[in-house]
């Protein structure tokens, strides 16, 4: 029996770019005279079945269906192939398609039409979204996270993937990698299948800058590539305190009134060459 070759994906989404991969399970054969010829045909469901959530029923009223597009017949010797790919199909985006196979043995006897499951054809890549690098995992779940300019960790990069979408076959996976300031990759590509919070393991150096590159794939195997908007600098060292003094010592001669909440006051100077000083307490 014929079926679509889903490669681990949903069977309704594997057709793209005018080709359809078919898995005939154990193949079609005749133990006496062998399979000498296979006829194939392509069927397109009516417009009432448009959309991925409306698959047609297994069989139609007329069998085999009257509206079939014949495909080139194929000569075989003894046994039909278990897997094959049919190219240059005139398929319609967003419509359900299936292939029917008819086998003829060595003495001309014809097997019944064997249909594959219906496959929704998706010929468009996903809608590009945004890859936002954040400093903490909590920031990834905020309503409108801002792009980080610096991060202190060298072992992980936290990010959230927003607004990636595919109306036809849906989002399948995200292939993530880091690229340096020169555009060359600085990490291996890894695959994730979620987008709210991604914890990407890396090995970064102090002062190393990077961007995130995303290849977003839908279930039909089509993809869109996105690079994060900002370049992030790794700052793995704390700020430097250059001067600490209490008022009243050295050149600072001030009269202070002690109170219950004030014992002494200090002055300090701090700087950070990489990411700057964000706050003083």
What is each of the regions a protein language model found here?
Residues 1-281:
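Low-complexity, disordered linker/stalk regions enriched in Pro/Thr/Ser/Gly
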């Amino acid at each position: 029996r014929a079926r679509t070759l889903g490669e681990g994906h949903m069977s309704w989404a594997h057709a793209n770019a005018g080709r359809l991969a078919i898995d005939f399970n154990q193949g079609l054969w005749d133990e006496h005279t062998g399979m000498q010829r296979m006829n194939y045909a392509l069927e397109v469901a009516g417009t009432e079945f448009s959309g991925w959530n409306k698959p047609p029923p297994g069989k139609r009223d007329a069998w085999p269906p009257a509206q079939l597009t014949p495909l080139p017949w194929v000569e075989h010797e003894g046994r039909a192939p278990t897997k094959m790919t049919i190219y240059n199909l005139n398929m319609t985006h967003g419509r359900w398609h299936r292939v029917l196979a008819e086998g003829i043995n060595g003495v001309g006897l014809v097997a019944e039409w064997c249909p594959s499951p219906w496959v929704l054809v998706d010929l468009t890549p996903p809608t590009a979204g945004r890859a936002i690098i954040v400093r903490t995992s909590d920031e990834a779940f905020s309503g409108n996270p801002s792009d980080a300019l610096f991060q202190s960790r060298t072992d992980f990069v936290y990010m959230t993937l927003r607004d990636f979408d595919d109306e036809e076959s849906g989002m399948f996976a995200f292939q993530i990698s880091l690229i340096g300031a020169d555009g060359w990759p600085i990490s291996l590509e890894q695959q994730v299948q979620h987008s709210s919070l991604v914890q990407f393991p890396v090995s970064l150096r102090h002062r190393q800058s990077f961007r995130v590159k995303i290849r977003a794939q839908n279930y039909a195997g089509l993809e869109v590539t996105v690079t994060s908007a900002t370049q992030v600098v790794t700052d793995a060292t704390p700020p430097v305190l250059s001067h600490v003094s209490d008022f009243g010592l050295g050149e600072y001669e001030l009269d202070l009134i002690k109170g219950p909440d004030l014992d002494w006051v200090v002055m300090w100077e701090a700087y950070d060459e990489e990411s700057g000083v964000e706050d003083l307490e």
